[in-house]
Amino acid sequence: MDKRHILMLLAVIIISVAPLIIYSGHGEDDGYFGGADDSAGDAITETGYKPWFQPLWEPPSGEIESLLFALQAAIGALIIGYVFGYYRGRGESSE
């Protein structure tokens, strides 16, 4: 391997491992990694907001909700990949 590739690989490893070493267990109890959804939901419920509508169907568990989210992301990625491939193929065939 070229020296440049080895240095780049070492840089990637250092950048990947450094946050794990620096934040190993720190901040979990303080809520640093709570997420935007949790904080936004708490901010909305503090004002006494009542929803206008009820969901038509609510998933029975968090795992199914995660599955549906992953399925939605996969379908979106397939559509985007198809569109990029279509336009790239159309551009190559016109040349």
Swiss-Prot record:
NCBIfam families (alphabetical): cbiN, PRK02898.1
Organism name: Methanothermobacter thermautotrophicus (strain ATCC 29096 / DSM 1053 / JCM 10044 / NBRC 100330 / Delta H) (Methanobacterium thermoautotrophicum)
Encoding gene per record: cbiN
InterPro entries listed in its UniProt record: CbiN (IPR003705)
Name this protein carries in UniProt: Cobalt transport protein CbiN
CC terms in the record's Gene Ontology section: plasma membrane
Subunit (UniProt): Forms an energy-coupling factor (ECF) transporter complex composed of an ATP-binding protein (A component, CbiO), a transmembrane protein (T component, CbiQ) and 2 possible substrate-capture proteins (S components, CbiM and CbiN) of unknown stoichimetry.
Sorted UniProt keywords: Cell membrane, Cobalamin biosynthesis, Cobalt, Cobalt transport, Ion transport, Membrane, Transmembrane, Transmembrane helix, Transport
HAMAP family, per the entry: CbiN (MF_00330)
Entry keyword annotation includes Hydrolase: no
Domain of life, source organism: Archaea
